[in-house]
C-alpha cells in the first residue's frame, strides 16, 4: 500500500489497516487520528508532526521511525517496536506503552505524562528534558519491570511516578524532579542523581550503592533499609528523613543536613560526616565504627546505645546530646 491509497481510504472513512506494509513512507503532518495500524510495518517511515492521537499501533514495527513532534496522545502502543526511533518533542500523554521496545530511542523533551510504561524497555534511551509526571513504570506481580538501564533522564519530570522495582542501573537523573516518586526496591546502583529533587520520595529498600547524590534534595524521604554504601551524598539535604536500618557505610555525607533524621540502627561505619548537621537526629543503636564526625553538629541528638568507641568526634558539637550510656552531654 502506498501513501496516496492510505490517505484516500482514511479520508473516505476507513480506519482499519491492520498489518499493512508502509516501510519508509512519508506521512509528514498527516492527520490519522484513531487509525488502526496494529501489526503494521512502518519501519523507517517519516511521521514528523503527524496526528496519531487514539491510534492503534499495537505490536507495530516502528524501528527507526521519525516521529518528532507527533501527537500520540492516548495511543495504543503496547508491544510496539520503537528501537532507535526519533520521538523528540512528541506528545505521548496517557499513551499505552506497556512492554514497548524503546531501546536507544530519542525522547528528548517528549511528553509522557500519565503514560503506561509498565514492562517497557528504555535501555539506552535519551529522555533528557522529558516529562513523565504521573507515568506508571511500576513492577506488577514481577511480570512487568521497566528497564531504564543507562538511560539519560537528565532534568526529567517524574513527580509522583511509580518506579517501584525499576531497573535504573547507572541511569542519568541529574537535576530530575523526583518529588513524591515511588522508588521502592528500585536498582539505582551507580546512578547519577546529583542535584535531583527527591523530597518526600519513597525509597524504602532502594539500592543506591555507589550512586552520586551530591547536592540532592532528600528532605522527608523514606529510606528504610536502603542501601547507600559508598554513595556520594556530599551536601545533601536529608532533614527529617526516615532512615532506620539504612546502610551508609563508607558513604560521603560531609556537610550534609541530617537534622531531625531518624537513623536508628543505621550502619554509618567509616562514613564521612565531617561538618554534617545531625542536630535533633535519632541515632539509637547506630553503628558508628571509625566514622568521621569531625566538626559535626550533634546537638540534642539521641545516641542511646550507639557504637562510638572508634568514632572521630574531634570538634563535634554534642551539647544536649543523649550519649550511649544515657547521660546528657553538657
Segments from the language model and where they lie:
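Tandem repeat scaffolds
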Residues: 2-330
Amino acid at each position: 500500500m502506498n501513501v496516496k491509497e492510505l490517505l484516500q481510504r482514511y479520508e473516505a472513512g476507513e480506519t482499519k489497516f491492520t498489518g499493512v506494509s508502509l516501510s519508509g513512507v512519508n506521512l509528514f503532518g498527516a492527520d490519522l487520528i484513531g487509525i488502526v495500524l496494529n501489526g503494521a510495518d512502518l519501519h523507517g517511515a517519516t511521521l514528523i508532526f503527524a496526528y496519531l492521537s487514539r491510534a492503534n499501533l499495537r505490536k507495530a514495527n516502528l524501528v527507526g521511525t521519525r516521529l518528532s513532534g507527533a501527537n500520540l496522545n492516548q495511543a495504543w502502543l503496547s508491544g510496539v517496536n520503537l528501537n532507535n526511533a526519533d520521538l523528540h518533542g512528541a506528545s505521548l500523554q496517557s499513551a499505552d506503552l506497556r512492554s514497548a521496545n524503546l531501546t536507544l530511542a530519542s525522547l528528548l523533551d517528549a511528553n509522557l505524562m500519565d503514560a503506561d510504561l509498565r514492562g517497557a524497555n528504555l535501555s539506552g534511551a535519551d529522555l533528557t528534558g522529558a516529562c513523565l509526571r504521573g507515568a506508571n513504570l511500576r513492577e506488577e506481580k514481577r511480570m512487568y519491570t521497566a528497564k531504564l538501564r543507562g538511560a539519560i533522564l537528565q532534568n526529567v519530570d517524574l513527580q509522583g511516578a511509580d518506579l517501584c522495582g525499576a531497573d535504573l542501573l547507572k541511569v542519568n537523573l541529574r537535576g530530575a524532579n523526583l518529588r513524591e516518586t515511588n522508588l521502592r526496591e528500585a536498582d539505582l546502583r551507580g546512578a547519577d542523581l546529583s542535584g535531583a529533587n527527591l523530597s518526600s520520595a519513597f525509597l524504602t529498600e532502594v539500592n543506591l550503592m555507589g550512586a552520586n547524590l551530591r547536592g540532592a534534595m532528600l528532605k522527608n524521604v523514606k529510606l528504610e533499609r536502603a542501601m547507600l554504601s559508598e554513595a556520594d551524598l556530599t551536601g545533601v539535604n536529608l532533614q527529617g528523613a526516615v532512615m532506620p536500618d539504612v546502610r551508609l557505610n563508607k558513604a560521603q555525607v560531609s556537610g550534609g543536613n541530617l537534622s531531625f533524621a531518624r537513623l536508628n540502627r543505621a550502619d554509618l561505619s567509616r562514613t564521612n560526616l565531617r561538618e554534617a548537621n545531625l542536630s535533633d537526629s535519632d541515632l539509637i543503636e547506630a553503628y558508628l565504627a571509625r566514622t568521621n564526625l569531625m566538626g559535626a553538629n550533634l546537638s540534642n541528638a539521641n545516641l542511646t546505645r550507639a557504637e562510638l568507641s572508634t568514632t572521630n568526634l574531634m570538634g563535634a558539637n554534642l551539647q544536649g546530646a543523649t550519649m550511649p550510656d544515657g547521660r546528657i552531654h553538657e
